[in-house]
A protein has these predicted regions:
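Charged, amphipathic alpha-helical segments
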Residues: 164-171, 234-239, 350-361
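Aspartyl protease active-site motif detector
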Residues: 86-145, 187, 227-231, 304-346, ...
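Eukaryotic endomembrane system proteins
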Residues: 181-192, 198-277, 282-296, 316
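Generic preference for well-ordered alpha-helical elements
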Residues: 81, 180, 184, 248, ...
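Aspartic protease catalytic domain
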Residues: 2-39, 91-93, 101-103, 173, ...
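Extracellular/lumenal carbohydrate-interaction signature centered on repeated Trp-anchored short motifs
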Residues: 178, 244-247, 308-310, 364
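Beta-strand secondary-structure signal
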Residues: 85-87, 184-186, 252, 370-372
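Disordered propeptide/prodomain
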Residues: 1-99, 107-181, 204, 219, ...
Length: 497
């Protein structure tokens, strides 16, 4: 019989899952930082909308041209970027890189020291670092004869030319691009290997080394060390680690929504009793969900469900690289009309830079209605006013609240950070589903996410396989009660043997 163990690990910067033995699944946890300055109080919706639409031009290339979707930092002032990034350590000795968290792309890439036309400073207030394979004792260049290269060439994610290097060349819809070659080196991370012991771990991974960049990628005000793609491709870090049994094939994030930002990114699963799940639409390059309807203040909007159906040029994508949220025209107009109708008596509707805004003299919580995005599987995503409103630029009469949902210029609806913030999101790739629940993503709250080792059965070969997950504080209470009852049952059964 497997044993049960509750382990509590409280730390502001790191949470992880216990590794109970060979084949166990420790969680890798990365601390997030918010690109928004802490003193920012307003957002130019037009600036964000322009940045997001440039990004969407790149995303849509995956539908028509089969080009791998890599996000760039944006086409506008980074003050309004609204992007989350994390630090990863690569090489020997380990070197730290700031990389953008992006569920809309697949592969981790960082800038090479030999990169041409690459910025040397960043408007994000971070020091830029450059990867030098020659300075890492564990680095190796992926050659054209390598099996990894031959397999990804078949999916147009690699190419071979001179120098026998397995290369890549990504061109984006805004005219920017990056090219380089694949390398293999160590990724370093912290792991819980017992109830309270943190160990330094590492694993060899394949990632991109950018040697040439063009367009907006070359501009210092938008510069960052690279992109951390969390897509479903076999070369994503999540897929690589999961294929070797180092982590489960699942990752989670909790983005803090206020001005100071931050949060947690976990290569593992966070459990919460209020979590709801919706199945991923199969055979899609992005994280597509089946959005079926939208309700405002409990009233279903008059939207034909077919406008959300997934096809070559339609669907609903979850994308952490998009700041706002975009709805297809057939859904956007009814949504705005419903919000206007709900608040017209207590606010002053105004149009600012083409966006519907409202002058409000009191808290928006008691004025604006609750919104429900309803997905397949009976999963509802409940949105508070802060999940669909943003502060606009000051106008005559005050600083308005503006609708952060925008009209998509195509048939694809995209759920960006505006609706993803202040929620735990779980991308369960093994079960092909995404889960979410409201959660306070402040560091002081996140530090009370607990580690639960729920059992250590043995397989036929005698290998210990521990089932592990991160659990929220509220879930821990119910687990303790359940385990206490199981222990009593076990004791009673043994006593009567």
């Amino acid at each position: 019989m497997g044993f049960f163990l509750i382990a509590l690990f409280v730390a502001a910067g790191v949470v992880a899952v216990v590794n109970g033995g060979v084949g166990g699944f420790p969680a890798r946890v990365l601390t997030l930082e918010r690109v928004f300055p802490a003193n920012m109080t307003t957002v130019d919706v037009e600036v964000l909308r322009t940045r997001d639409r440039v990004r969407h031009a790149r995303i849509l290339q995956r539908f028509s041209g089969g080009i791998v979707d890599f996000n760039v930092v944006g086409t506008s002032d980074p003050y309004y970027g609204g992007l989350y990034f994390t630090k990863v350590k690569l090489g020997s000795p380990a070197k730290e890189f700031n990389v953008q968290i992006d569920t809309g792309s697949d592969i981790l890439w960082v800038t090479c020291s030999s990169c041409s036309d690459c910025p040397r400073s960043s408007g994000f207030g971070i020091d830029l670092n450059f990867f030098d394979a020659g300075s890492s004792s564990t680095a190796s260049t992926v050659s054209c004869s390598d099996s990894i290269c031959s397999s990804i060439i078949q999916t147009s994610d690699a190419s071979c030319s001179t120098g026998n290097q397995c290369g890549y060349n990504f061109q984006y819809g805004d005219g920017s691009g990056t090219s380089g070659h694949y390398v293999t080196d160590l990724l370093h991370f912290d792991t819980i290997v017992g109830p309270s012991l943190i160990a330094n771990s590492s694993s060899s991974i394949t990632f991109g080394c950018s040697t040439y960049q063009t367009g907006s990628l070359t501009k210092p005000d938008k510069a960052i060390d690279g992109i951390f793609g969390f897509g479903q491709h076999r070369l994503s870090v999540v897929s690589q680690l999961a294929s070797r049994g180092i982590t489960p094939n699942v990752f989670s994030h909790c983005f803090r929504g206020d001005g100071t930002g931050g949060g947690k990114l976990v290569l593992g699963e966070i459990l919460d009793p209020n979590m709801v799940y919706s199945p991923l639409v199969p055979s899609q390059p992005h994280y597509n969900l089946d959005l079926q309807s939208i309700a405002v203040n409990g009233q279903m909007l008059p939207i034909v469900p077919a406008v959300f159906a997934t096809s070559d040029n339609r669907g609903t994508i979850v994308d952490t690289g998009t700041t706002l949220t975009f709805l297809v025209a057939e859904a956007f107009e009814p949504f705005v009309n419903a919000i206007n109708s709900a608040v017209s008596r207590v606010t002053t509707p105004v149009i600012s830079k083409g966006t519907q805004c409202y002058l409000v003299t009191s808290s928006i919580t008691g004025i604006f209605p609750e919104v429900s995005l309803n997905f397949a599987g009976g999963a509802a995503m409940i949105l508070k006013p802060e999940n669909y409103l943003v502060h606009g630029d000051p106008i005559e009469g005050g600083t308005p609240w503006c609708i952060g949902f925008q009209k998509a210029q195509n048939g694809v609806s995209i759920l960006g950070d505006l609706v993803l913030k202040d929620k735990i999101f779980v991308y369960d790739l093994s079960k092909k589903r995404i889960g979410w629940t409201d959660y306070d993503c402040k560091p002081t709250i996140l530090s009370h996410i607990f580690i639960l080792l729920v059992g250590c059965p043995r397989d036929a070969a005698g290998t210990t396989l521990c089932i592990a997950a991160l659990v929220s504080g509220s879930f821990l209470i119910s687990i303790i009660i359940m385990i206490t009852l199981l222990c009593w049952i076990y004791v009673i059964s043994v006593t009567h043997l």
